[in-house]
Amino acid sequence: MQYEFLKNFPKRMKNVGLYGVLIQNSIQKTSWKQFGFLKFDEQMNLIFAVMLYIMEQSLREENCTMDDIGAYIDTINTRYLGKEISYDDCRKLGDFVVNVILSNEGRAMYFDGYDFEENDYHVMHISYVANRIVYLDQEVRRTSYYLTDDGYNLILSTLEIENNMK
């Protein structure tokens, strides 16, 4: 290969794709306006705050239901963000972030990354969150969310890896 620095290009593009697909899923959505999140910056901050919450719940091996996510958004909204939205709206906002933005409404997400060694594009699957059925008090059936490897890679690339390089 003439340019050695292009050797792991698909891996780099997978990381770029994690951001690209997330932004693409979020930027055109008008639903943000009904919750008072008009600026792209606000939207990205909330998405990552929700992802961090899901990660923390997973690391603690605790369930992370939509009720939990809604309560979390309500708490950070009341304490920090100050948007004029109700608890019910916070739950709807959580559902929007998790199921529309992060899960693409159940449709698979892909990003094409070029492989200079094979002279072709590689289609890379992207998935930020997954879910499983849990039973609360052995009776109530709920969906609990957790980050996938892609979700962890995205979150960890925002701070933890940079700190490890210092």
Where are these regions (language model features)?
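Positively charged, polyanion-binding regions of nucleic-acid-associated proteins
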Residues: 41-66, 95, 159, 165-166
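Eukaryotic basic, amphipathic alpha-helical target segments in cytosolic regions
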Residues: 58, 77-81, 105
